[in-house]
Amino acid sequence: MCGRYVNVTSVEAVEKRFQVTAGPDYTAAPPPPNTNVSHGDLAPVVTGDRPDALQAMQFGFTPAWAKKQFYMINARSEGDHNADNDPGYRGAMGILQKPMFRQSIRTRRCLVVADAFIEGPQREKLAKPYVVYARDGQRPFALAGIWDEWTDTATGELVRSFAIITTTACDTLQAIGHHRSPVLLDP
């Protein structure tokens, strides 16, 4: 699971790295630098429908059709396949069939801006955290994500939220005893 990550890079550096502009909707209430982004926090993303704009969304995905708000932080690329988290798995990407994610994975993908992510061994979890940076030292980098818009029927508030797409553990995470890895992208 990639349930926590770091985002402390300045807006100007993110704009340069991702070739985007933070518009008025972002700069009016930008997410603060955060060394422990977790579900419910606002964080910067770049969406496929607005690839030139830096946007702020809530970490913790809720699909548009949901009756109540969820905080799904991860979307498994394999869906229900590979239940044992076999790092050698090369089968179907079941995320395309999961009702929770199938619409967003097709039409609402995003880049999640991160400086590092935080993981722990499968047994100790975040009681023994490791901060994982990109191997080449590039900061910030992009994690693959999906997003959606959900309207709170009680308040009418529109909540734009995202989840990080995960896959089987990379060599680095296997070495610390973790079973999943966020999908890293080159922006």
Residue ranges of predicted features:
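Short linear sequence motif anchored by a di-proline
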Residues: 1-187
